[in-house]
């Protein structure tokens, strides 16, 4: 009797390395997650790395989610999202950016987080060799979208002020460009583009026949000095041909609920919904019901508190190093002073020795010159951590 020897070797345990795809092998684990894992092992760390609000979910949203569970609304929803939430989204977009939907041209789909919306949008748009322009620095998942979809991410260098302007974007556009992915307010820099800058980008994309994707997960975290007419500037105010991606997790402190939405050209939104059918199926049902009343929540006290924390960061490093003033979100992208002769990675390794956790800039960029601070932490802890970082720079 002949025994078959599998390609991975003699009979016995599976050769797992042979089974893992080249796609998976090409993607590194998130540098942010590595810092989170380190924080879990440290005793009393000063954690300035985590990118989620430190305030509780508004009571009205908790009650709505609990009521949905108690009413046995725990099964699948339609892929696009429950009608009640879609209605609330369109009412909000009408007031916020002037979009009147749904129409034959405009559609929306509720997604499993904004990250879910972004990956589904990339899947719907990119074929092998297609290009998408992303900012550098970028949110960590942006740079991996090419490996996940077969497309190519073209990094738009925004140093030193971290403003992704039309002039900078145009240098990156080629005949293979399908889309420009913009994030304002941005992660990791907190940059908020002005209405004039956004209109220039809208005009550029229209002229080049390129789709503008606007990741606005932090749109409610826009500080008073960056708001225009009381709102966070958005390219959607100038065009209904951009793809708008927003969410609830960062805004209302419910990041674990995994809920966002994509709105924009209906033909593209329908393709995103099709991919959702075969991946996430639908966004979490009880979370959808939970956020229906969210648009009526007053966030101004929380945003004002974060604006004060922003000022703590800016004041700490004034005259010591370069920190472009964040206009929103809850991050600052801090340059390691050149006189120290250190990379961002080397600096954060020393910070860890002082119990301070920040994220090295090379997680978000092709450069290794900066680090990201999250000021979404208690003011006393923030002050302690900032004092240590300042001391490291001035020692």
Where are these regions (language model features)?
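PLP-dependent class I/II
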Residues: 2-28, 36-42, 46, 50-68, ...
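Glycine-rich loop-to-alpha-helix module at the N-terminal edge of alpha/beta enzyme cores
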Residues: 35, 72-75, 88-92, 97
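Intrinsically disordered, tyrosine-centered linear signaling motifs in cytosolic regions
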Residues: 75-76, 218
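Short beta-strand to alpha-helix junction loop
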Residues: 80-81
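Conserved AMP-binding/adenylate-forming core of the ANL superfamily
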Residues: 85-89, 113
């Amino acid at each position: 009797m002949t025994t078959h020897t599998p390609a991975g070797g003699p009979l016995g345990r599976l050769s797992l390395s042979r089974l893992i795809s080249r796609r998976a092998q090409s993607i590194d684990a998130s540098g942010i997650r590595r810092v989170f894992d380190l924080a879990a092992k440290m005793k009393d760390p000063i954690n300035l790395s985590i990118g989620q609000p430190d305030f509780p979910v508004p009571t009205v949203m908790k009650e709505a989610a609990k009521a949905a569970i108690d009413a046995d609304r725990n099964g699948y929803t339609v892929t696009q999202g429950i009608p009640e939430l879609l209605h609330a989204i369109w009412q909000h977009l009408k007031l916020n950016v002037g979009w009147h939907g749904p129409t034959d041209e405009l559609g929306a789909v509720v997604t499993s987080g904004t990250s879910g919306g972004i990956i589904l949008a990339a899947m719907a748009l990119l074929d092998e060799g297609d290009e998408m322009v992303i900012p550098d620095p970028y949110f960590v998942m942006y740079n991996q979208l090419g490996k996940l979809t077969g497309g190519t991410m073209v990094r738009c260098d925004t140093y030193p002020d971290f403003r992704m302007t039309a002039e900078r974007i145009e240098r990156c556009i080629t005949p293979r460009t399908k889309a420009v992915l913009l994030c304002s307010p941005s992660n990791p820099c907190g940059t908020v583009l002005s209405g004039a800058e956004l209109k220039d980008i809208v005009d550029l994309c229209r002229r080049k026949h390129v789709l503008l994707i606007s990741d606005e997960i932090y749109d409610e975290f826009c500080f008073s000095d960056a708001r225009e007419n009381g709102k966070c500037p958005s390219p959607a105010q100038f065009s209904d041909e951009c793809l708008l991606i927003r969410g609830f997790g960062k805004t209302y402190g419910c990041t674990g609920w995994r809920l966002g939405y994509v709105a924009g050209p209906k033909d593209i939104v329908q393709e995103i919904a099709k991919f959702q059918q075969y991946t996430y199926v639908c966004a979490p049902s009880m979370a959808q019901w939970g956020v229906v009343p969210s648009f009526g929540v007053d966030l101004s006290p929380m945003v004002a508190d974060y604006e004060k924390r922003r000022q703590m960061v800016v004041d700490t490093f004034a005259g010591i190093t370069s920190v472009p003033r964040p206009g929103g979100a809850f991050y600052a992208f801090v340059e390691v002073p050149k006189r120290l002769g250190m990379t961002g990675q080397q600096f954060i390794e020393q910070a860890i020795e002082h119990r301070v956790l920040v994220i090295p800039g090379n997680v978000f960029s092709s450069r290794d010159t900066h680090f990201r601070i999250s000021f979404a932490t208690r003011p006393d802890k923030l002050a302690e951590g900032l004092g240590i970082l300042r001391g490291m720079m001035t020692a």
